[in-house]
Amino acid sequence: MSTSLPPLVEPASALSREEVARYSRHLIIPDLGVDGQKRLKNARVLVIGAGGLGAPTLLYLAAAGVGTIGIVDFDVVDESNLQRQVIHGVADVGRSKAQSARDSIVAINPLIRVRLHELRLAPSNAVDLFKQYDLILDGTDNFATRYLVNDAAVLAGKPYVWGSIYRFEGQASVFWEDAPDGLGVNYRDLYPEPPPPGMVPSCAEGGVLGIICASVASVMGTEAIKLITGIGETLLGRLLVYDALEMSYRTITIRKDPSTPKITELVDYEQFCGVVADDAAQAAKGSTITPRELRDWLDSGRKLALIDVRDPVEWDIVHIDGAQLIPKSLINSGEGLAKLPQDRTAVLYCKTGVRSAEALAAVKKAGFSDAVHLQGGIVAWAKQMQPDMVMY
């Protein structure tokens, strides 16, 4: 199936003398040339997130001369971001990611315009925001935002480039419900339903090899330039799958699913994706303790079994003194339940409190009715009780 598309953007009227000098290596490419560079100059591209995928994509789109770049990010730079989010530096830790990204972009190319949207993308603002741009790029790492971006792009009539990464793997594609010649597909044609909560970890939980971000982001940026200028064949209707350990790329055809309901409105995506599973939320009700409460329990000599449900690689980085490692996967399979002591109150913890709530549901179903989990996980414990603790 051919996915050649007409140019998404009309060309600007002219290039300045400075622009001709700056983009000269583009101008001498026959398929791109002056016309293509004028289209890049006139383009308005919105990038969702200045994180692992957004960071290198923003840098290359800016260097390529995309005339207006919008950045959606409400987060601040954390030291753990620097391993892969190359648009930020040590001096930016604690700063707004959007502002840090803007400063890096301006340092590379002062000829373009950068618009900041320091907000949380939500059903109340997504469609109106998308209508201000020609093209959207989504590299977010949670399913609620991915489905929101997809549905808002459909309602706004906008194409978007999507990418994702996990450990040593990456994926990328182009979605555009209203693409010409009946080529339209959207994210729900590939993934009609989100996976069960907890099945697919985020980068914070599962990790990612930092340089994988550059590989996938370069594909995303390339697709953006192809869409804007109308050159080549895009990934519309195809999923690109990258495996860094095998150093392989393969593509999978995406076809329109006629059974997928038509998107007519935005919904509550946290609820739709079940960010926390229903049984986990139910188990945590009345069975959640704060770091302060755990400290008091430990100091009082209460009989506890402190259970770390994270993966062994996380345990090796840091753990709470006196804890026992029983990964959530072993608890869910039943193998780890036999390791839980019967004569003490089990206190489960993970990194941020999500996985421990999910493990708590399995523990309670097994008869450990007095088991509890730690609110906010080891991150909250470190911040409130042990600020000198190493954190990842």
UniProtKB/Swiss-Prot annotation:
Annotated Gene Ontology cellular component terms? cytoplasm; cytosol; membrane; peptidoglycan-based cell wall
Question: How does the protein associate with the membrane?
Answer: Single-pass membrane protein
Q: What is its EC number?
A: 2.7.7.-, 2.8.1.-
Gene expressing this chain: moeZ
Out of the domains of life, which is the source?
Answer: Bacteria
What lineage does UniProt assign to this protein's organism?
Answer: Bacteria, Bacillati, Actinomycetota, Actinomycetes, Mycobacteriales
The compartments listed are: Membrane
GO MF terms here are:
ATP binding; nucleotidyltransferase activity; sulfotransferase activity; thiosulfate-cyanide sulfurtransferase activity; transferase activity, transferring sulphur-containing groups; ubiquitin-like modifier activating enzyme activity
Has UniProt tagged this entry with the keyword Oxidoreductase? no
Q: Which UniProt keywords apply?
A: ATP-binding, Membrane, Multifunctional enzyme, Nucleotide-binding, Nucleotidyltransferase, Transferase, Transmembrane, Transmembrane helix
Its GO biological process annotations read:
cysteine biosynthetic process; cysteine biosynthetic process from serine; symbiont-mediated evasion of host immune response
Q: Which SMART domains match?
A: RHOD (SM00450)
Q: Which residues form the Rhodanese domain?
A: 300-390
User: So what does this one do?
Assistant: Catalyzes the conversion of the sulfur carrier protein CysO to CysO-thiocarboxylate. The reaction is thought to proceed in two steps: first, ATP-dependent activation of CysO as acyl-adenylate (CysO-COOAMP), followed by sulfur transfer to give CysO-thiocarboxylate (CysO-COSH). The sulfur source is unknown.
Q: Which residues make up the binding site for ATP?
A: G52, D73, S80, N81, L82, Q83, R84, K97, D141, N142
- The primary location reported for this protein is membrane
**Leading EC class:** transferase
- Give the transmembrane region(s): 45-65
Q: Where is the active site?
A: C203 (glycyl thioester intermediate), C350 (cysteine persulfide intermediate)
Q: Which family does it belong to?
A: In the N-terminal section; belongs to the HesA/MoeB/ThiF family.
Q: What is this protein called?
A: Probable adenylyltransferase/sulfurtransferase MoeZ
